[in-house]
């Protein structure tokens, strides 16, 4: 550090009534004002020379005016010798250690770090010219510059600084004034305090002082204050629609009306508003104000040229408390920091780069905290040195500094810079946390009957009412409308298939009623209401097998089914009572992704399959001869060989086939009377209908493409943020509405959604309640246990795997989960549905994932250039509740629902399947097979696991997925849940092929036995004890519960030669020596030559 200052050894105390600023002489003092003593380290409080401290009794405080100068007198006794001893120890501290010590100090109310908005203003005062401060750049997270034309802001970009300007900034802080915790309420007072301090450091003539003060009090012109009178309103782009322009009658942030500014309020003195003038909202960019976090403070960087100066005036000021200085900052927030650099004319670009450096490091997370907690100049220098210790240097011959670097999508965490024992920014090898992906109190076995269920209820009860309050959002309305349409079609389709399999004993109306009743109960009382219940393929296979068995052995299907359902419900309740859901911790990412991928692929496959099957009803008339179009016909004729069903129909309705004029019948009349269609223009089920299949394909793919496009509209560059967010939230609903209107206008008879319009059982020979025994023999009560066991496994696996996927840590759920409570609700409603002869419903994976994705929360207040942060999921019960309430009311809405084309719903299925695949690591790894190594994405697991092991893991997972698909598509689909359970054992076997470290990166670690846990814990404690013995130096705990080597003489020996102290090495550089020489020259020389 450059020495050689001839300034007096003392501390100036600027005082007003009840106000005092801590002034640090820095380079002007011959003593470094810092002591690291044992007692102070233990208490995390440091005694600084220059600050009045009570010693034994309260000292009397003298009050002085700004212009008075006071120098402390006194000898250097014992305290001074202790300071020298501390200095010797300090010389061996790295900047990182000093910063850790500063950040470890206790916080008080006046030094709590806030978010900062930094503004760079520049001025050039020359004789005879009227100058004003002009805003040239601003920082909220990234740098934005006023473009050369002065009409617009640049895109946010990552600031690139020259190392030379950083060295110059450090020199400024060493040789300039540092005033910490200044108490002032106006820019005039701040200017007087700064100039008073400058008079102690150098001789300022009255004319220079007046000129500098005049410069500091000049008016500030901000970019948003451009003339609006010349702007024609129609010229405003659509991107500004929705942005609030400045309005004197606007509401302020607290909701209070700000009245128009009166003439007296607009009086200015020396270009600055009076002390008590209110904020003039006509000069505030309210749209940009929304991006500033609540409670943020301002950091003003003022640099410029003044022709009367022969050497620079530098000052760093921290106000306490922060003060709202009207007209100084672009937005009306209180100012906490000021950095002032005024120098001779001719070096404006140099001052600009120093100002950019100051503003940029103020946005640095670590230096930002240091600036708030600094007690003196050396703390700020330690912060800059630590910043320099972490910077990355770009070779001058390989990079153009004028290129603006786009802000990264994800900003790396700076927590590693707060970790002790990591010298020079070298990050130690970080191992992933060795616990499983679902560890938590929800899955701990209590050992008590229904213990897990009781804990689930206690965990969810405090959040119950908030589950309804949190639903007051347009996002929930969009989610509800989208998922209602998405849930209706599979429920009705499942009911139709079930009706075909059971000869109408359970059909569409029962499916609709069962889904509505089960969904409402689950949404009201389940532990995780984000899960959506639906029908599953294995359940349909089970129903088919059971119906065939009952038909072969002359048993009542509905009665036996009711018994099996009751036994299944009872067994599920037993699983709840025994905390069996704790076994979920064995379901790792390997099993989750295989199961979720299969369900997503099934959604995609079935959507395309249903579209293809439309060709059977609406065939394509291929190889048409255009010259013979006039000869095409399709007529209704008498069946040549009527079957018994047709003859019985004619007999029941007294129809004489020979007397019917078949050729004159309409299509519907011909079908009703069991006639046949004959002719070259006939299809499978009647006359050929042109264009239907192709129009259905258009609707199908258009729905998928438009939904996907509108969903990503949130990240586009068009329209304001609020409009983009709303379009993105309502993407699927808007798509369905658009396609329905388009289909109605085109008029092509596409297949429509068929909803039952009467609320009664499908068959007249059954009611809404089923006798569990009925006509069946008594032994069926006991025999029903066997298929109930299989059903229990089916229900448990489907429900819990979906619950695990929804409750993953990546979703940042805050209200906890309830595996036991979820399973209880499914079991109870399964029993109710069995008694009422309704289908069984369990958690639907794709619908649940889609529900969660539609409720994602992102930060609204994001800095320009910063990607919105994912905050979590809007956890509430209302969307699921309304989906199933409206589903139950669908019977009375057939007049509207009949207009929805089925291809549109198939397109929604395709969209849900594809969108649910996003974020599944298995598909990311699958794509690696077709990529050369140099083009592969920078996935974190590729850094730590060999590529061949990654491919092996993916192949095993792919093989399991193919096996699951084969079983699912075969008649043996009823054992599908057993195969999903087998995946857990396959994953356990993989422990033999992969190391624990590799699996921790590719998958979640499976729980180990209690004995092995104890052995591992004991071994870890022994290793840590040996490590502590090998490391020298005293250790003491910080508030962050980390260990930091106390600064002392013992740290002077460094066993690692690569560990350097940048504060020691910097003075050895030629650049720093040149700066030091210049700063030590006479007053005529500038330190920036």
UniProtKB/Swiss-Prot annotation:
Tissue: Expressed in the hippocampal neurons (at protein level). Highly expressed in brain with lower levels in lung, kidney and heart. In the kidney, there is high expression in the inner medulla, localized to the inner medullary collecting duct. In the brain, there seems to be three transcripts each having a different expression pattern. The smaller 3kb transcript has highest expression levels in the thalamus and the largest 9.5kb transcript has highest levels in the substantia nigra. The middle transcript of 4.4kb, which is also the main transcript in kidney, is highly expressed in thalamus.
Reaction(s) catalysed by this chain's protein: 2 hydrogencarbonate(out) + chloride(in) + Na(+)(out) = 2 hydrogencarbonate(in) + chloride(out) + Na(+)(in)
Transmembrane helix found in the keyword field: yes
The keyword Ribosomal protein is assigned to this record: no
GO molecular function: active monoatomic ion transmembrane transporter activity; identical protein binding; sodium,bicarbonate:chloride antiporter activity; sodium:bicarbonate symporter activity
Extracellular topological intervals: 1-476, 527-563, 615-685, 751-776, 844-879, 924-960
Entry keyword set: Anion exchange, Antiport, Cell membrane, Cytoplasmic vesicle, Disulfide bond, Glycoprotein, Ion transport, Membrane, Sodium, Sodium transport, Synapse, Transmembrane, Transmembrane helix, Transport
Subcellular location: Cell membrane; Apical cell membrane; Basolateral cell membrane; Cytoplasmic vesicle, Secretory vesicle, Synaptic vesicle membrane
Positions annotated with a glycan in the UniProt record: 644
Transmembrane regions listed in the UniProt entry: 477-497, 506-526, 564-584, 594-614, 686-706, 730-750, 777-797, 823-843, 880-900, 903-923, 961-981
Stretches of the chain found on the membrane's Cytoplasmic side: 498-505, 585-593, 707-729, 798-822, 901-902, 982-1089
A Pfam family the protein falls into: Band_3_cyto
A cellular component term, taken from the record's GO annotations: plasma membrane
Membrane topology: Multi-pass membrane protein
Residue span of region Disordered: 55-90
Gene3D superfamilies in UniProt: Helical hairpin bin, Mannitol-specific EII, Chain A
Annotated disulfide bonds: 634-682, 636-670
Family matches, as InterPro entries: Band3_cytoplasmic_dom (IPR013769), HCO3_transpt-like_TM_dom (IPR011531), HCO3_transpt_euk (IPR003020), Na/HCO3_transpt (IPR003024), PTrfase/Anion_transptr (IPR016152)
Record-linked SUPFAM superfamilies: Phoshotransferase/anion transport protein
Similarity comment: Belongs to the anion exchanger (TC 2.A.31) family.
Function: Mediates electroneutral sodium- and carbonate-dependent chloride-HCO3(-) exchange with a Na(+):HCO3(-) stoichiometry of 2:1. Plays a major role in pH regulation in neurons. Mediates sodium reabsorption in the renal cortical collecting ducts.
Subunit comment: Homodimer.
The protein's name in its UniProt record: Electroneutral sodium bicarbonate exchanger 1
